[in-house]
Amino acid sequence: MREVHHNNALDFLKNCPSGIYDTIYIDPPFNTGLTRKSARGVGQYQDKFDDFCSWLYPFIEESKRVLKETGTIFLHLDQNEVFHAKVLIMDEIYGRHNFVNHIVWSYDYGGRGKNCWPSKHDDILMY
């Protein structure tokens, strides 16, 4: 099955049969501390750690159900949440022994911080 789906991920995953996908790539909003609301007004959450984890956890649970035993999941985050998500969510649901790689996507564009070093990378966890 070669398909790309762009919609409410949790609703979509809940309606999928179990064990059908070879690859899942999740790129959730980053935890910025702001109130986030989707374009359609669905799925509002406070972009803070506790809300972020409780918002992300069900997606990861459902992703495990629909992923084949031999499948791979990629979770794309930034430096604010990658380690929390790895230990508190991904290792718990997928198992630490299934961790494959921590991919660092480095780039050279973006703003320059006045009070700190600017982040010039994103993090992708692979299980």
Mark where each language-model region is:
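Core catalytic lobe of class I
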Residues: 1-127
